[in-house]
Structures are given as C-alpha cells and as structure tokens.
C-alpha cells in the first residue's frame, strides 16, 4: 500500500494491508481517498507521526489472536486485546482464576445421588482426590463414596440428627453372596413334606408319643 500526501511530494510505501488502514483511519477519524482497491491512499496532510502510529497499530494487531467467527470474537476486541483475544464467554471460561461450579440445578432429583458443591477446606487440611461427596436427596444424609475401591463403602453421616450416631461404615456384600443358596431337586420334596407337618399318609399327621399311648387304651 502506498500513502501519498496532498501535495504529492511526500509519500510512503508499506506492506501493511489496506483493511488495517481503514480501521486505523476510522479510529482516528481521518479523511482520505483511495484508488485501485486500496493500493494507493491520498491524504490531505501526510505526517510522520501519523505514519509511526499507524505502523505501531498494525504491529499490535498482528501480534494478537485473529478474530474468530466460531467463538464470536469481534474485531474490536481483537484489536484492543480485551478478553484475551476471545469473546466474553470464552474469556470468562478460560480465565486463569475462573472456577467451574458443579452441582445440581434442580432441588428435586427423584432420590438420585447427585454431586453438590463442597465448601473449600482450610489450606492446612489435606484434600483427598480419590473421595467425592454426594448427597442423597430426600433422605437427609451425606454419603461419601471412594472411587477405586473394590466394593462401595458408604459412610452415612446424619444431617438431621435422626440416626443417633456420627458416622457408620458398612461394607456391602457381593451380589453372589447375598443370594439364597440354590435348592436341589431332591430337597424340594423334602421341604414340601416339612410344610405339610411331616405327613406321610395322605397328608395326615402321624400320632406321636402320648397320643399313641392314649389310643392304645
């Protein structure tokens, strides 16, 4: 691009694209004329200080991230450097001090176990990365589940004072041990006879001890 003064004596050639000149001129509110699609620019007065400022403006723009239509970054934000060269949402999300908030948005979750935000502990207290706190909705107790354990070991803490104890740890038995032992085919008939009070003759109970002696009389 070639910048020429009104008198034609002063001129400056640069490799800066014309679109940056338009942004610079709009910010400075400069009046100019251009020919050949911006290859030549005519100013009323060509000032060396103005050219220096224009080169510095172009250098600042080229060093910052370019505007992205995907993230919605405006050209003014990219030029000024606001938001780290990103849109408002992206800058807030990728800010080094930004903290994500996890937890349920609805107060009622049908009794499901949902993660809730836990208050930050004091700097002196160590944080356990392998433990996550969950709250059971509608039951008023806090359950701590340890990730990586072979079996879930919930520690129930009474939040409403209804259990009468501070904490209780119980280990859930495997599903294979919790099932009742299988009944073989031969034991099924024996159990059936026991339910019928040991009947052997047509479902009637045999007389025992004193009843047999009384019948002999």
Swiss-Prot record:
Induction: Expressed abundantly in the late phase of the viral replicative cycle.
Membrane-spanning intervals of the chain: none
Basic residues compositional bias, start-end: 188-197
Subcellular location: Host nucleus, Host nucleoplasm; Host nucleus, Host nucleolus
Region ranges (Disordered): 79-113, 171-217
Main location: host cell
Biased composition (Polar residues): 202-217
Similarity comment text for this entry: Belongs to the adenoviridae U exon protein family.
Name the UniProt record assigns to this protein: U exon protein
Lineage: Viruses, Varidnaviria, Bamfordvirae, Preplasmiviricota, Tectiliviricetes
């Amino acid at each position: 691009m070639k910048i020429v003064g009104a008198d034609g004596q002063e001129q400056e050639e640069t490799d800066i694209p014309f679109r940056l000149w338009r942004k610079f001129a709009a910010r400075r509110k400069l009046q100019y004329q251009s020919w050949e699609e911006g290859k030549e620019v005519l100013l009323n007065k060509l000032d060396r200080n103005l050219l220096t400022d224009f080169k510095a403006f172009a250098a600042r723009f080229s060093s910052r991230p370019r505007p992205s239509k995907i993230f919605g970054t405006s050209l003014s934000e990219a030029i000024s450097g606001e938001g780290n060269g990103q849109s408002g949402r992206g800058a807030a999300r990728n800010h080094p001090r930004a903290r994500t908030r996890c937890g349920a948005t609805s107060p009622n979750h049908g009794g499901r176990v949902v993660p809730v935000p836990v208050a930050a502990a004091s700097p002196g207290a160590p944080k356990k990365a392998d433990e996550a706190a969950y709250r059971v909705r509608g039951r008023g107790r806090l359950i701590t589940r340890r990730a990586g354990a072979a079996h879930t070991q919930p520690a129930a803490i009474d939040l409403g004072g209804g259990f009468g104890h501070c904490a209780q740890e119980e280990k859930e038995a495997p599903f294979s041990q919790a099932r009742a032992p299988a009944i073989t085919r031969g034991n099924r008939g024996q159990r059936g006879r026991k339910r019928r009070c040991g009947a052997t003759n047509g479902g009637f109970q045999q007389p025992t001890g004193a009843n047999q002696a009384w019948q002999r009389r």
